[in-house]
């Protein structure tokens, strides 16, 4: 599902005499359907950068990123958007949504973009919001008014609303209470069971042991940069 070959990324600082900061180099790994792989390494080693490269938020300097056969490197915007609509989900650490959009619609949006009927999409959204213990009286409010923990759970619900074949997870259990943490781990296991390929960042070692099949130490790629 994921196939990454000879991937490189260097940031160029245009406002500092074109200074170059190598981030990752010679990145090579695969992730199969039904497998969850954790990216590990110290802060600043390039874990989040790798996720953003795979999602197409950053342009790669060189290499190949295949997601279900689509090469993200060099893909045009339309191809990237289609990949995100039907194949590749991304649960980030921070919720980014338009103001005043109700929470239930925020969670349902990936399903609507994939062509799901409104009633079915909102039913799925209600199920996930209840599962993640978001009080029902908040569902019609914008999640931008919520606490940090509530926003994180809305973000997780949104990321798991559509059954993506591939998922990127950036600290999905950070700052969650024990009950919600376990719920999210169960959701990850369920996604694996249906064949989803997952790449994640988990600073929670117990969570890594629970859901991840193996680990990739990103510092090896950073050291070669």
Which residues are covered by each model-predicted region?
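Helix-to-loop junction immediately C-terminal to a conserved catalytic motif
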Residues: 55
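Conserved ABC transporter NBD signature motif
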Residues: 63-71
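ABC ATPase NBD coupling module
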Residues: 72-89, 193
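Q-loop/switch helix immediately C-terminal to the Walker
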Residues: 101-112
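Conserved ABC ATPase signature
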Residues: 142-146, 150
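ABC ATPase C-loop
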Residues: 159-160
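Catalytic Walker B motif of ABC-type/P-loop ATPase nucleotide-binding domains
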Residues: 167-170
């Amino acid at each position: 599902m994921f196939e990454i070959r000879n991937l490189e990324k260097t940031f160029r600082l245009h406002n500092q005499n074109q200074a170059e900061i190598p981030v990752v180099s010679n990145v090579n790994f695969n992730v199969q359907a039904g497998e969850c792989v954790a990216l590990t390494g110290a802060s600043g080693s390039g874990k989040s950068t790798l996720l953003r490269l795979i999602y197409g938020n950053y342009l790669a300097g060189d290499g190949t990123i295949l997601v279900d056969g689509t090469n993200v490197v060099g893909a045009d915007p339309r191809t990237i958007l289609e990949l995100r609509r039907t194949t590749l989900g991304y649960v980030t650490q921070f919720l980014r949504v338009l103001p005043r959009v109700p929470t239930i619609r925020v969670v349902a949006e990936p399903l609507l973009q994939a062509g799901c009927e409104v009633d079915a999409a909102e039913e799925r959204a209600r199920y996930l919001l209840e599962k993640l213990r978001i009080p029902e009286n908040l569902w019609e409010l914008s999640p931008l008014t919520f606490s940090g923990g509530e926003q994180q759970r809305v973000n997780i619900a949104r990321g798991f609303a559509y059954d993506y074949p591939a998922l990127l997870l950036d600290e999905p259990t950070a700052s969650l209470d024990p009950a919600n943490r376990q719920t999210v781990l169960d959701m990850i296991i369920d996604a694996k069971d249906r064949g989803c390929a997952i790449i994640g960042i988990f600073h929670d070692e117990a969570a890594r042991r629970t859901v991840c099949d193996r680990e990739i130490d990103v510092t090896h790629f950073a050291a070669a940069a």
